[in-house]
Amino acid sequence: QDQARAGDAFGRGRLKLHVLPFVEQERYDELLWACDINFVRGEDSFVRAQWAGRPFIWHIYPQHDGVHMQKLRAFMAHYCEGLPPDAAQALQALWLGWNGEGGVSAWNDFAQRQSMLRQHSRGWARRLAGNNLALNMLDFFREVGKMRGFKIQAGGKL
């Protein structure tokens, strides 16, 4: 069979893949919450996968000059902060393999650390949910101000 269809299921070792039909956009978050691991593509799905608090693999859209791999590596470095080195390595190897740099043989290392990666994903989602956009923007502008020699005071005065 050349093409997988909704309802098909495949397995190899501990990996089980279920081909699901497309769902309405309104139900996409529910689908992400229901899966053990999510494979996502595109920025909107990437953000939603982070909010879902489940391990995910980001298949980033290719860009000219390989810029997409720089974005992927930058995000992985940030996302993997706080993970034990072996778990960070397993996640990074699978993400890179899935995006064409390396092999997908990294699956076994990833799968062995699935419980730890699940906890990390939940913690990441909690940190994202706990941040206040207005306060984050203020912190950002304070940092920019420091770099440029400005000081932001109460009342928004420079």
Residue ranges and their predicted role:
Residues 17-29, 89-90:
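Short charge-dense sequence patches
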Residues 9-13, 28-29, 110-111:
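N-terminal start-of-chain detector that recognizes signal peptides
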Residues 55-101:
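Nucleotide-sugar donor-binding patch of glycosyltransferase catalytic domains
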Residues 12, 50-56, 114-119:
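Short acidic (Asp/Glu) and glycine-rich catalytic loops that position anionic groups and cofactors
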